[in-house]
UniProtKB/Swiss-Prot annotation:
The gene is uppP. GO terms for cellular component: plasma membrane. GO terms for biological process: cell wall organization; peptidoglycan biosynthetic process; regulation of cell shape; response to antibiotic. Its EC number is 3.6.1.27. This is Undecaprenyl-diphosphatase. GO terms for molecular function: undecaprenyl-diphosphatase activity. The chain crosses the membrane at residues 89-109, 120-140, 163-183, 194-214, 227-247, 258-278. It catalyses: di-trans,octa-cis-undecaprenyl diphosphate + H2O = di-trans,octa-cis-undecaprenyl phosphate + phosphate + H(+). InterPro entries: UppP (IPR003824). It comes from the Bacteria. It is a multi-pass membrane protein. Keywords: Antibiotic resistance, Cell membrane, Cell shape, Cell wall biogenesis/degradation, Hydrolase, Membrane, Peptidoglycan synthesis, Transmembrane, Transmembrane helix.
Length: 281
């Protein structure tokens, strides 16, 4: 049985979750790094998944009108074929299609994700490797297609990219936004679809991990129910602000800012591991 989590740790980790969930820098990787470097232990995959419900509530509220319109449009198209060309109907299917890869892989490899995939050597390496992928997407992407131009193949490709985020250090938004840029989408269109695409996967992941988070059986920091609640509320508030900021930021700024940050962080963590300052597991 792991060590009990302190209130300071819960507050800090909830803040980290809110700040990093929607940025292409890997929230799960940051939670793992901050837990190990500052608190000497891992908060665990279940803590990560449950606090993600806070940030997911933020995206549900921020995009409430879009979500309501998409759901209504999807049902309208099901019963009225003349509406099946509407963007909202198509977007409903794109979210469903894009969720399948992460759902299947997440179920098949859930044990590996909770244990070996949280190794800091892997996380630091993926921070750097995927920074190069994001840089390539920014450089080669045409960035001309609006969200109205989304097609089913875009949903499949971006959904497959989202599945890469099962590896801490990759980043859910980093994977989907990069794929969108490679497909020619504008940064804003890629980011908007990325947020909508994340909703089913993250909600399912958080709900699936909820029982384990309250009664942890493995090693690492064990959060109490009240601590999980507070951390999740903090993640919600900061996550909401992060969504608004990112959507404004990507309109006029490139992804290179995040590339530089990821590389610096990855190098720092690799250095700490190589010198024995922190443990990889």
């Amino acid at each position: 049985m792991g060590e009990a989590m302190s209130w300071l740790q819960a507050i800090v980790l909830g803040t980290v979750q809110g700040l990093t969930e929607f940025l292409p820098i890997s929230s799960s990787g940051h939670l793992r790094i901050v837990s190990e470097v500052f608190f000497g232990d891992d908060a665990g995959a279940s803590f990560t998944a449950v606090t993600q419900l806070g940030t997911e509530a933020a995206v549900l509220i921020y995009f409430a009108r879009d979500i309501g319109r998409i759901i209504a449009g999807w049902f309208r198209g099901l019963f009225h074929p003349e509406h099946r060309g509407d963007l909202d109907y198509r977007m409903g299917w794109y979210v469903i299609i894009g969720t399948i890869p992460v759902g299947v892989l997440g179920f098949l490899f859930k044990d590996q994700i909770r244990t070996g995939a949280r190794n800091l050597w892997l996380i630091a390496t993926m921070l750097i490797v995927f920074a190069l992928v994001i840089a390539a997407a920014e450089y080669y992407g045409r960035k001309v297609r609006p969200v109205e131009d989304l097609r089913a193949k875009d949903g499949i490709i971006m959904g497959s990219a989202q599945a890469l985020a099962l590896i801490p250090g990759v980043s859910r938004s980093g994977g989907t936004i990069s794929a969108g840029l490679f497909l020619g989408l504008t940064r804003e269109a890629a980011a908007r679809y990325s947020f909508l695409l994340a909703i089913p996967a993250v909600v399912a992941s958080g709900l699936f991990s909820l029982p384990d988070a309250f009664e942890p059986a493995g090693e690492g920091l064990n959060a109490s129910g009240p601590q999980l609640l507070v951390a999740t509320v903090i993640a919600f508030a900061i996550g909401y602000a992060s969504i608004a900021w990112l959507l404004r930021f990507v309109v006029d700024h490139s992804m290179y800012w995040f590339v530089g940050y990821r590389i610096i962080l990855g190098v720092v963590v690799l250095s700490l591991l190589a010198t024995g300052v922190v443990s990889a597991t």
